[in-house]
């Protein structure tokens, strides 16, 4: 039986389009990743009509759904079995995510313990391989 979140609202983003860097469409050497314009005459910085929009605090997500996954859980990074037990009382709000640097031996232990504590993991199959027949 899978664990379901205690509270699962509809996640609404105020803006789904990415903020792109000024003149990144004009020059290939400029990446599309956002950089705040600092020039004294810059039209984007001065917020002229028809220019790219700048990110600001008003585009932030709802406080209740911020950092929430589409499943309705919030992520918690787990490096060992002991860190998994922090989620014991919060298993309907948080789900564990096994850290990148964890070995496959420790991953197996974490997955087993999570199943016992009924804690959901986002990546339970990561770097786990069943034995191949020879």
UniProtKB/Swiss-Prot annotation:
Keyword Ribonucleoprotein on entry: yes
GO cellular component: cytosolic large ribosomal subunit
One GO biological process term: translation
UniProt cross-references to SUPFAM superfamilies, sorted A to Z: Ribosomal protein L32e
PROSITE patterns assigned: RIBOSOMAL_L32E
InterPro entries (alphabetical): Ribosomal_eL32, Ribosomal_eL32_CS, Ribosomal_eL32_sf
Keywords tagged on the record: Ribonucleoprotein, Ribosomal protein
Gene Ontology molecular functions: structural constituent of ribosome
Similarity comment: family membership: Belongs to the eukaryotic ribosomal protein eL32 family.
Protein's UniProt name: Large ribosomal subunit protein eL32
UniProt source species: Drosophila pseudoobscura pseudoobscura
Taxon lineage: Eukaryota, Metazoa, Ecdysozoa, Arthropoda, Hexapoda
This protein's encoding gene: RpL32
